[in-house]
């Protein structure tokens, strides 16, 4: 009988995203999650930011991802991948990998860095169009999704700055009643931001969260 066993694993969660073909990683980025995918249960934001190339974990997670990709069967055409790892000090533990684009604003973040849309590239590669027009940016990128809280949404004032690259917010949400986040991708507001390095990105994420919390008004039950 086939069995699957799960165990609790210590560590912070990182993800590696990119494109793979013929045992070669064509393009990739390494990011660290800000909070985790269960954050919606406490109505706290979820996001991630790209780590610096000089960060030793960047190479270590690249090597770990390539090792996984070359051990599993993959199609002949280019595929996107989204891999996740636990990192506990020097210990790296493989969590999972999928031949798909990661959620949240991972695709937007990757495109801002490389000029490559992972979703479109995946579709094109399946019909024989395998051309990558890579234009690497000096910007580091991050994203943050803010789930709804409990109550009727009365008003939202969105943050604006030169480093805010994109904001997703549905204006028709005003007046709607919420009971908090429902799942990991619950997002009332989502920001795509850019910065100079991972510390800069972390500070900007914290700034947006604090500012948005004061500028999103609910009428409690």
Model segments located where?
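Peripheral (often C-terminal) accessory segments that flank ATP-dependent C-N-forming ligase machineries
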Residues: 121-221
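Structural signal for hydrophobic packing residues in well-ordered secondary-structure cores
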Residues: 65, 69-73, 209-212, 216
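A short linear hydrophobic-aromatic micro-motif
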Residues: 2-4, 132-133
């Amino acid at each position: 009988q086939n069995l699957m066993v799960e165990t609790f694993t210590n560590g912070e969660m990182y993800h590696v995203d990119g494109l793979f073909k013929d045992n070669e990683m064509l393009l990739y980025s390494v990011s660290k999650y800000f909070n985790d995918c269960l954050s919606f249960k406490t109505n706290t934001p979820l996001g991630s930011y790209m780590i610096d190339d000089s960060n030793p974990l960047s190479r270590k997670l690249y090597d770990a991802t390539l090792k996984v990709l070359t051990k599993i069967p993959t199609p002949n055409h280019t595929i996107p991948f989204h891999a996740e790892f636990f990192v506990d000090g020097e210990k790296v533990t493989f969590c999972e990998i999928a031949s798909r684009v990661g959620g949240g604003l991972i695709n937007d973040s990757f495109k801002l860095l490389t000029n490559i849309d992972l979703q479109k590239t995946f579709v094109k590669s399946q019909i024989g169009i395998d051309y990558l027009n890579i234009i690497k940016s000096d910007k580091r990128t991050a994203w943050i999704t803010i789930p709804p809280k409990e109550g009727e949404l009365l008003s939202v004032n969105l943050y604006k700055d030169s480093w805010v690259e994109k904001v997703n917010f549905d204006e028709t949400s005003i007046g709607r009643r919420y009971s908090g986040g429902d799942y990991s991708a619950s997002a009332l507001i989502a920001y795509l931001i850019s910065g100079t390095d991972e510390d800069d990105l972390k500070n900007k994420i914290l700034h947006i969260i604090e500012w948005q919390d004061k500028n999103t008004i609910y009428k409690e039950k």
